[in-house]
Amino acid sequence: VKSTNLMAFVATKMLERQEDLDTCTEMQVEKMKASTKARLRTESSFAPRTWEDAIKDGELLFNGTILQAESPTMTLASVEMKGKKSPIDFAPSNIAPIGQNPIYLSPCIPNFDGNVWEATMYHHRGATLTKTMNCNCFQRTIWCHPNPSRMRLSYAFVLYCRNTKKICGYLIARQVAGIETGIRKCFRCIKSGFVMATDEISLTILRSIKSGAQLDPYWGNETPDIDKTEAYMLSLREAGP
């Protein structure tokens, strides 16, 4: 009952900030809300209460606090059993992630030099993401560049850290079945619940495969270091995706 009340409270509050959620996270919260209502109906035989009552009880239970995950693998329910609490704050940068979305709280590494050998690789279906720095921005800037070696088979997306204006990742998206799921899973490895900001070319391509994106004003007044980007992409292509 306590878990159900908490989930009702969290789902309701997160959906009140719907404009701060990307499409994938919004769908997860909606599913969370639907499953919580189903649990509420099941519990009605021994703990009858309305949805509104569950929301109020969930808020009162923690005295205006919300559980916050300690690691990417912990869900809201698993943290609840540990009894951890933190002040409730539904500002855009503090919405608690759902499921296994990572939480990033530390700042970006200031002395990143673009070296590839410390990169972290993520593979999901037709998408391969190379994360090259501990970039903890909640919103990424992407520059799309067709992969010359596989022009008709894939697209390459270079991700920039909005704090340092340096490369923070590199995504290869092949045109295969299920690529939307693959891209979403890759993005969820490095961000938490926010819309992907892109340039105009990337926006068109991402929307063509139904991945949530929005234009970024950064591209209207600044230009990335194209030479460094080209050299970086070339080194990745030579090393293989």
Swiss-Prot record:
Keyword presence, NAD: no
Entries under InterPro entries matching the protein: Flu_C_NS1 (IPR005187), Flu_C_NS2 (IPR005188)
Coiled coil: none
Keywords: Host cytoplasm, Host nucleus
Subcellular location(s) per record: Host cytoplasm; Host nucleus
GO cellular component, one term: host cell cytoplasm
Function: Suppresses the RNA silencing-based antiviral response in Drosophila cells.
Name the UniProt record assigns to this protein: Non-structural protein 1
